[in-house]
């Protein structure tokens, strides 16, 4: 429910076109205006504010900002952002809010709240005329399931924004290379969806009768684990789950490990990979139901070796969606089915 999800056929139709892909003028202009506004302000901290899958998507921004710069950055779920009223929130803050529909009440209110504090506010949404976008000073809207190239969709737009922002906060030539190589994103998404299609189907076939599936990850990928757990397994498939941080696994959660307890482990490619490997080694000893998505095995064709760590998180959402599709296919439970969401007041 968070990453850009093109169907396999739609993606494969674009593979091998071999021409330089550029973002649409409208989208490029939106990002340029935001970056210009950032340059004019004395930004001292950054808040990423949203709910659910949108919050998970924004969390990659916080990961890269905190990893690459000394600018404090935070992730908040929208309602807590309002109720906690962070002391650091002021006219020197950048607040990025996101809602796919643009009408998530808590996030709309969070945008208004941040703007009232004098913060520079940026809204990200599918719909430019949504309530959320109307509350923020600046907007970024992305294309979705309309056969657009991925550079104009949510992942491409957000990563372009984040690396343009990094270039302002802590200039580095590698960010320019990331921005240039994002033109490969569409093709890489297609290739990795195809690469993991069999594994995803086998996952669905093997675990279709499981009532609980734990996910585990660290670094940037804990946000993918959270999204897969909350949005795909719990919300869409009604499978009990919990996203366990690999670094926290041995501080309590590992006691639930048993031969019949399923784990989906995301083996990351960043500095925290040793945490994932340690946890994986343990669950493999005691559980017969361990599946691994090894980020180092993704197809990174066209990406510089030293930039792969930045692209892994951009590709993993589409890969994990393949695993969810496998479960949906073999359980006969469509990902679109809801019991409560959008059907009643809550």
Predicted region positions:
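Internal helical hairpin/lid segments
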Residues: 223-290
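Structured C-terminal subdomain patch of bacterial secreted/periplasmic proteins
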Residues: 296-335
């Amino acid at each position: 429910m968070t990453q850009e999800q093109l169907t396999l056929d739609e993606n494969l139709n674009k593979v091998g076109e071999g021409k330089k892909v550029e973002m649409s003028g409208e989208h490029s202009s939106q990002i340029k205006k935001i970056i210009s506004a950032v340059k004019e302000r004395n930004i001292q901290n950054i808040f990423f504010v949203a709910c659910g899958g949108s919050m998970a998507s924004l969390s990659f921004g916080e990961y890269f900002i905190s990893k690459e710069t000394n600018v404090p950055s935070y992730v908040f779920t929208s309602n807590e952002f309002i109720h906690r009223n962070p002391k650091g929130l002021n006219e020197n803050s950048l607040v990025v809010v996101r809602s796919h529909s643009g009408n998530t009440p808590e996030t709309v209110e969070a945008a208004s709240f941040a703007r009232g504090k004098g913060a520079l506010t940026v809204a990200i949404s599918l719909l430019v005329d949504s309530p959320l976008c109307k509350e923020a000073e600046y907007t970024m809207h992305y294309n979705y399931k309309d056969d657009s190239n991925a550079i104009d969709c949510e992942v491409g737009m957000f990563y372009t924004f984040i690396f343009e922002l990094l270039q302002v906060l802590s200039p580095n030539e590698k960010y320019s290379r990331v921005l240039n190589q994002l033109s490969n994103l569409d093709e890489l998404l297609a290739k990795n969806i195809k690469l993991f299609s069999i594994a995803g189907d086998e996952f669905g076939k093997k675990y279709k009768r499981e009532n609980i599936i734990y996910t585990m990850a660290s670094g940037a990928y804990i946000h993918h684990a959270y999204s897969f757990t909350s949005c795909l397994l719990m919300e869409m498939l009604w499978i009990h789950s919990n996203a366990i941080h690999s670094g926290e696994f041995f501080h309590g959660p590992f006691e639930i490990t048993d031969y019949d307890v399923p784990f989906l482990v995301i083996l990351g490619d960043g500095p925290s990979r040793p945490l994932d490997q340690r946890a994986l080694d343990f669950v493999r000893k005691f559980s017969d139901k361990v599946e691994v998505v090894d980020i180092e095995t993704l197809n990174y064709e066209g990406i510089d070796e030293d930039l792969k760590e930045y692209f892994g998180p951009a590709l993993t959402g589409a890969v994990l969606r393949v695993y969810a599709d496998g479960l949906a296919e073999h359980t006969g439970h469509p990902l679109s089915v809801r019991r409560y969401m959008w059907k009643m007041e809550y």
